[in-house]
Design a protein with these regions (language model features):
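GIY-YIG nuclease catalytic motif and its immediate N-terminal context
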Residues: 1-30, 34, 47-85
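Cytochrome P450 catalytic domain signature, combining two hallmark sequence patches
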Residues: 36-42
């Protein structure tokens, strides 16, 4: 599945993270919270910036993850940024 994380405050230019997990999303989120996932999320944690999972594509695969990342406008998929929350 593919997931979208929204940052409470921008870190440099970034305000979102798109990731993929094959099985257990909650376990992956716990790894991110423990600074053992993506380096970007570890930097957020170290700077005290809160973040949350705002969207999940349950049938998403790595191909979808790459397409979403290549789109370069992840805010378009974020319900908090588009006002659809």
């Amino acid at each position: 599945m593919v997931y979208l994380i929204h940052f409470q405050t921008k870190l440099h230019h970034a305000q979102h993270y798109i990731g993929f997990v094959a099985s257990d999303l909650m376990q992956r989120i716990e790894l991110h919270r423990a600074n053992r996932g993506a380096k970007l999320l570890a930097a957020l944690n170290n700077n005290g910036i809160n973040w949350q999972v705002v969207r999940v594509w349950l049938n998403g695969d790595r191909t979808l993850e790459c397409r979403l990342k290549n789109y370069k406008k992840s805010r378009c998929f974020c319900p908090l940024c588009t006002g659809k929350a």
